[in-house]
Amino acid sequence: MEQQQPQQQNDGQQQQQQQQQHQQQQQQQQQQQQQQQQSEQERIYNKKQEHLPLLQTVEELVEELRRSLIVVEEFQTPSQQLLFDKLNKIINLYEKIESNRHIVNDVEIPLEIFRVIDQSKNPDLYVKETLQNCLSANEKTKGKIESIKNFKKELESHISESFASEYAEYKLLTQKKETQEQQNDDQIKVDDSNNNNNNNNNNNYNNNNNNNNNNINNN
């Protein structure tokens, strides 16, 4: 009986240490997730800034097409020069868009968007419906995950009470495995970050070269 009490105390201390280590790991994971989210937000912002000039050109082209359509529908002989000017401007805008097409080479557009546009519907509604469907699916998945987590906690609680020493040994082995996996994941993230930085540097270099070539051609 006296031997069992120290053994139970040791098991209790091990469980406390494991819980503390688990909490520390969770905090580290949360910090890493926050850093990843911040990096992703910065990447998206930089990408939007990169696409902004092209987007403005497209908007300008759409507006010129609209105005040209009005001129054509109400065409009169004195407005011929105005129509020529607008056509020349439209051509220049198309050329400008074509010269910057490399900026959006990595942009993927779902084909369903074009079907929506062909039906004279607002593509923003398609985006809204898609996001709503994703949110609904995520909520269902989240509910399933929470149920599994609660079941796991309840099961571990009963096992730790019934098989204290075996459970402590199991947690120790699991802790070692999680630590090794975390180290491997961290190394992979570092490698991916280095590769992304190299790719961004190469893209910036190519963009600068293209801009220089465009400036030379314009001159």
Curated annotation (Swiss-Prot):
It comes from the Eukaryota. GO terms for cellular component: core mediator complex; mediator complex. Residues 177-192 have a biased composition (Basic and acidic residues). Its main location: nucleus. Disulfide bonds: none annotated. InterPro entries: Glucose_repression_reg, Mediator_Med10. Transmembrane segments: none annotated. Residues 1-39, 194-219 have a biased composition (Low complexity). Residues 1-42, 177-219 are annotated as: Disordered. GO terms for molecular function: transcription coregulator activity. Residues 13-74, 166-219 form a coiled coil. Keywords: Activator, Coiled coil, Nucleus, Transcription, Transcription regulation. GO terms for biological process: positive regulation of transcription by RNA polymerase II. SUPFAM superfamilies: beta-sandwich domain of Sec23/24 (SSF81995). It holds the Pfam family Med10. It is found in: Nucleus. Belongs to the Mediator complex subunit 10 family. Component of the Mediator complex, a coactivator involved in the regulated transcription of nearly all RNA polymerase II-dependent genes. Mediator functions as a bridge to convey information from gene-specific regulatory proteins to the basal RNA polymerase II transcription machinery. Mediator is recruited to promoters by direct interactions with regulatory proteins and serves as a scaffold for the assembly of a functional preinitiation complex with RNA polymerase II and the general transcription factors. Component of the Mediator complex. This is Putative mediator of RNA polymerase II transcription subunit 10. It comes from Dictyostelium discoideum (Social amoeba).
